[in-house]
């Protein structure tokens, strides 16, 4: 479906934004900054925690995309091969997606004023800092 959407966009727009729907900390300011930067750049990529890709801004079909495990390096290498000079935009608010319970903890810590954090509070999700094998302990109250 993504390839079909990019084929549809080719010739109709200069660039596309490819982004998953599970980026709960993203805000208007974050997105505006990346879009403004993309006006002077051929290829912007935002990695996710764990080596994946959370956002790409590029010309439609500039590279073949493949999302999943360690896709970030694959996308950067593909952009390099096409001489697109990939620029990495490193942002906590755009790098966090929801894959683990620790990610829910990050939302509780950094997601002030987000709908996701409000919902997690309704579910009585609690987080505490720990310094063991995990950084955050996430529990659900009764």
Model-derived segments and spans:
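Active-site acidic Asp-centered loop
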Residues: 19-21
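A short, conserved beta-to-alpha structural element at the edge of catalytic cores
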Residues: 44-60, 125-131
């Amino acid at each position: 479906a993504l390839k079909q959407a990019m084929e549809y966009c080719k010739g109709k727009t200069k660039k596309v934004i490819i982004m998953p729907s599970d980026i709960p900390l993203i805000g208007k300011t974050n997105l505006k900054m990346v879009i403004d930067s993309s006006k002077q750049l051929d290829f912007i990529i935002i990695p996710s925690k764990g080596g994946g890709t959370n956002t790409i801004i590029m010309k439609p079909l500039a590279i073949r995309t493949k999302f999943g495990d360690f896709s970030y390096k694959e996308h950067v290498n593909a952009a390099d091969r096409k001489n697109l000079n990939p620029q990495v935009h490193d942002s906590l608010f755009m790098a966090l997606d929801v894959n683990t319970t620790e990610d829910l903890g990050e939302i509780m810590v950094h997601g002030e004023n987000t709908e996701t954090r409000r919902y997690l509070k309704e579910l009585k999700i609690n987080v505490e800092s720990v310094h063991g094998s995990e950084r955050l302990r996430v529990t659900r109250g009764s």
